[in-house]
């Protein structure tokens, strides 16, 4: 009988022998190589089976089963506590202790620090439907010369901790687990892993899919400086690195939190304990590019071997990546329905708090605050007795909190601390509880005030009142195909990871303004700061842009990261990415749009705030000049924006940063990202801006991409063939086209009643554009990405189907629009056949030009 086996033993990869965690660890040796997995021995389930095979234990377990079946949780909890204590204090028979001690002694040649981690590995752990996140016990930094057997008993006993028993019982109620407590004992209930400790410089977790949306194209890595416990505890914010797996693993980029990690966890050899110390490394991204790539490669390899989405833990020591755990991702692996939560109206109030969204749901409820799990349970039960499911607010959670972290008891949870992989995030995600972490000052929310927790848009937002929302469920099955492409409008990378799973043919509009704002800098300011050099930056800049030596490089990197995440999320479908379309009043709000030049005898320096001395030499004999990069315009809507800005000497160099980011995206083989130029007024602008785009791609030895023009200015609609010489297609911006056709300021409240995208003049402009674009050879595509298709009814959609190649709508309208368009196309096909496919008759009946009638026939019947 094998009571203890080596990690490389063939039986170690059998879950019935070494439990969920243990078997996965053994499989990793074959997948990533033994040099990348810390050595371990495993106390098998046969050990636990033999240990627990006594009359008193078996009788108690049988009684536990009975009380759970009866619903007598109070007595069941008492029995579980007695079982835990009994097992922890058991005497281990010699036939069990002897092989254990021998194997522990053999570990000394592998654990050069003479310390091990003793981890529980339950036979029901790491199932495809349940994670048991952090519920079993783990003991770190256990000296090999100590009584390791004591920790083995503690791990086995943790199988009867109440939170574990309660969780197993909950899974049985949901029919996700069909084994009784008594049968678990017969199977051995628990294996124990004894693994060499890694004193990591950096550590983290990786998911082979996006853990919040289930997007399978994009994987996510989160890492912290020091030991990995810090990331699970959620005490510090962690950057997240996105990677794409196919055709080969490629790192897309890293998004750094606004308040990067300040404290790290290390092992103190003097005290024998882990202690927190300040982070000294000047790398807010934590992992080097090579390390991130290796983690991405390992994660991809592990997912392929398991043939399912995976969640792994890793540690980096002296530049070497070690994989320490792997388990199936339990939330999205078997999902058959995509659930979309959406506020019914845009809030007219600002959120009182923001943070990191976990999942994509919305919750409403009264606030209850608690700092420990005992108080949380009391508060939640008080509300439950009133028939209320509150929103629980705390600093952070641990496994003890799980008795209340259930949708039957709470509507949502808000934590001041944590990250996407902390305990609260993992459990909330698995149980479908709306959750926000890293919410500053959340505990200042008033007790019992009703709030709305909105996680639907990629960022967690908390509003201090009840907002109405709706839930749309989309079955992930085949929907009807349409000839007119249904596309979706996107605002941010996080939103794209969710929305890309809708049945669209791609994205009609990716607004990069969200990404630009997230860079935290005006691009012209970034270029100016780089020309002066990092040494000439004032302290306020060095603090704001900590760890960054070049602002323009950082600007490009952040744009590249955001765009590439969106492009990867939609692969292989195209996304149309609009270059930044901020107006002057919006650009003026970016950091650096207002800055200061400090002129000193030693040279010029630069600052975000007024200075009374030279930041470089300290001299007080300085001249501090206020610099404004943007100017005030009476009507920014008609001002310095779009193509006019890009080709201007005032902004051309900054526009080249956007182009550089675009080429970096294409270098990642993400050629499905198609550039779009907004607000093109004249053919002269069209010529200049397309030359800039082509030149940048040619200099990067890349294929010149398709180029799309926004059709917003009537000049494009009046002379479409002239503009078509410079682009490959058009996308109608219905808001601006209506504004400029009807001469109505789209922001005017007084004239709002006259603002109508279906006005005959606007429709005529669209008809002219389509006739010209479709007469070109090769044909220029025409789509729409404005607000109109999402807001107007079936008649306007029919007009668009007749004339356009694609229709872009907001995410909540994708399925509805797809079904309406399919119905319209079928009706039009029948109508055209009734007209004997006579373009003159079709033109007359539909009141459209013969050219547009010919296009409609070609489109619906695929004729040449």
Please tell me what each predicted stretch does.
Residues 1-193, 202, 283, 287-290, ...:
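N-terminal beta-alpha lobe that positions the nucleotide/phosphoryl donor
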Residues 16-50, 116-148, 197-240, 310-333, ...:
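Conserved phosphate/anionic-ligand binding catalytic regions in large, soluble enzymes, centered on
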Residues 41-94, 251-260, 266-268, 439-467, ...:
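A structural-propensity feature for long, helix-poor, extended segments
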Residues 41-64, 266-267, 271-273, 304-347, ...:
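Terminal amphipathic helices with adjacent charged low-complexity linkers/tails
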Residues 54-58, 324-338, 352-510, 514-531:
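Acidic, glycine-rich flexible loop/linker segments
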Residues 111-112, 122-132, 201, 299, ...:
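Conserved alpha/beta-domain cores
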Residues 126-128, 138, 151, 157-162, ...:
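ATP-dependent carboxylate/acyl-activation modules
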Residues 179, 219-311, 315-318, 533-538, ...:
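Conserved catalytic alpha/beta cores of large enzymes that bind or transform nucleotide phosphates
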């Amino acid at each position: 009988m094998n009571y203890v086996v080596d990690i490389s033993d063939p039986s170690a990869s059998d879950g019935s022998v070494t439990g969920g965690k243990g078997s996965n660890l053994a499989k990793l040796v074959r997948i990533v190589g033994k040099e990348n997995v810390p050595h371990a021995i495993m106390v098998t389930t046969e050990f636990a089976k033999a240990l627990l095979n006594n009359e008193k234990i078996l009788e108690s377990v049988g009684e536990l089963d009975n009380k759970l079946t009866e619903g007598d949780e109070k007595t069941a909890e008492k029995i579980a506590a007695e079982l835990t204590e009994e097992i922890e204090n058991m005497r281990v028979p010699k036939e069990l202790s002897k092989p254990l001690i021998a194997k522990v002694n053999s570990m000394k040649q592998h654990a050069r620090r003479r310390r091990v981690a003793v981890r529980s590995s339950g036979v029901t752990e790491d199932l495809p439907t349940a994670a048991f996140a952090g519920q079993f016990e783990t003991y770190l930094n256990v000296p090999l010369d100590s009584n390791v057997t004591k920790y083995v008993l503690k791990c086995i006993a943790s199988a009867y901790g109440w939170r574990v028993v309660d969780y197993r019982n909950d899974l049985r109620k949901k029919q996700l687990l069909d084994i009784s407590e008594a049968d678990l004992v017969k199977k051995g209930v628990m294996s124990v892993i004894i693994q060499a400790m890694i004193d990591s410089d950096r550590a983290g977790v990786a998911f082979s899919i996006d853990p919040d949306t289930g997007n399978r194209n994009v994987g996510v890595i989160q890492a912290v400086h020091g030991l990995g416990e810090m990331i699970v505890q959620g005490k510090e914010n962690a950057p997240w690195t996105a990677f794409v797996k196919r055709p080969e693993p490629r790192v897309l980029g890293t998004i750094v939190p606004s308040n990067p990690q300040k404290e790290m966890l290390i092992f103190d050899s003097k005290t024998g304990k882990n202690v927190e110390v300040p982070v000294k490394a000047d790398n807010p991204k934590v992992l080097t590019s090579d390390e991130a790539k290796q983690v991405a490669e390992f994660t991809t390899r592990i997912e392929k071997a398991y043939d399912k989405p995976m969640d792994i833990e890793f540690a980096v020591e002296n530049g070497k990546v070690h994989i320490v755990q792997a388990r199936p991702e339990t939330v999205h692996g078997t999902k058959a329905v995509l659930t979309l939560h959406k506020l019914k109206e845009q809030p007219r109030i600002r959120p009182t708090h923001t943070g990191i969204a976990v999942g994509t749901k919305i919750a409403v409820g009264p606030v209850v605050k608690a700092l420990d799990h005992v108080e949380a349970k009391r508060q939640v039960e008080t509300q439950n007795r009133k028939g209320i499911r509150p929103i629980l607010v705390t600093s952070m959670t641990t496994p003890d909190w799980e008795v209340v972290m259930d949708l039957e008891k709470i509507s949502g949870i808000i934590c001041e601390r944590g990250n996407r992989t902390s305990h609260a995030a993992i459990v909330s995600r698995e149980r479908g509880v709306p959750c926000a972490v890293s919410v500053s000052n959340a505990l200042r929310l008033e007790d019992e005030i009703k709030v709305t927790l909105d996680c639907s848009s990629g960022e967690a937002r908390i509003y201090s009142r009840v907002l109405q929302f709706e839930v749309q469920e989309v079955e992930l099955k085949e929907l009807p195909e349409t000839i007119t492409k249904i596309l979706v409008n996107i605002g941010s990378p996080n939103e794209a990871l969710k929305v890309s799973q809708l049945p669209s043919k791609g994205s009609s509009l990716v607004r990069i303004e969200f990404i630009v704002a997230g860079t935290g800098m005006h691009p012209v300011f970034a270029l100016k700061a780089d020309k002066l050099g990092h040494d000439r930056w004032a302290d306020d800049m060095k603090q704001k842009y900590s760890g960054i030596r070049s602002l323009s490089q950082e600007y490009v990197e952040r744009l590249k990261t955001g765009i590439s995440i969106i492009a990867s999320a939609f692969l292989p479908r195209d996304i149309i990415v609009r270059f930044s379309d901020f107006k002057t009043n919006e650009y003026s709000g970016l950091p650096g749009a207002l800055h200061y030049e400090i002129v000193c005898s030693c040279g010029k320096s630069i600052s975000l705030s007024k200075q009374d001395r030279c930041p470089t030499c300290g001299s007080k004999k300085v001249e501090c000049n206020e610099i404004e990069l943007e100017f005030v315009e009476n009507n920014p809507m008609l001002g310095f924006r779009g193509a006019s800005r890009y080709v201007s000497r005032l902004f051309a160099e900054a526009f080249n940063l956007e182009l550089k980011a675009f080429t970096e995206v294409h270098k990642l083989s993400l050629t499905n990202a198609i550039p779009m130029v907004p607000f093109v007024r004249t053919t002269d602008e069209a010529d200049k801006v397309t030359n800039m785009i082509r030149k940048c791609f040619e200099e990067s030895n890349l294929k010149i991409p398709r180029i799309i023009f926004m059709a917003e200015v009537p000049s494009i609609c009046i002379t479409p063939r002239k503009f078509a010489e410079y682009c490959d297609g058009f996308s109608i911006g219905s808001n601006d086209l209506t504004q400029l056709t009807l001469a109505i300021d789209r922001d005017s409240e007084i004239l709002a009643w006259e603002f109508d995208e279906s006005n005959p003049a606007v429709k005529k402009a669209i008809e002219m554009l389509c006739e010209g674009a479709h007469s070109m050879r090769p044909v220029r595509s025409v789509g729409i990405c404005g607000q109109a298709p999402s807001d107007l009814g079936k008649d306007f959609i029919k007009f668009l189907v007749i004339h356009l190649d694609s229709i872009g709508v907001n995410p909540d309208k994708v399925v509805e629009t797809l079904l309406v368009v399919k119905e319209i196309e079928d009706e039009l096909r029948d109508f055209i056949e009734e007209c004997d496919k006579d373009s003159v008759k079709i033109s007359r009946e539909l009141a459209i030009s013969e050219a547009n009638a010919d296009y409609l026939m070609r489109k619906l019947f695929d004729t040449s």
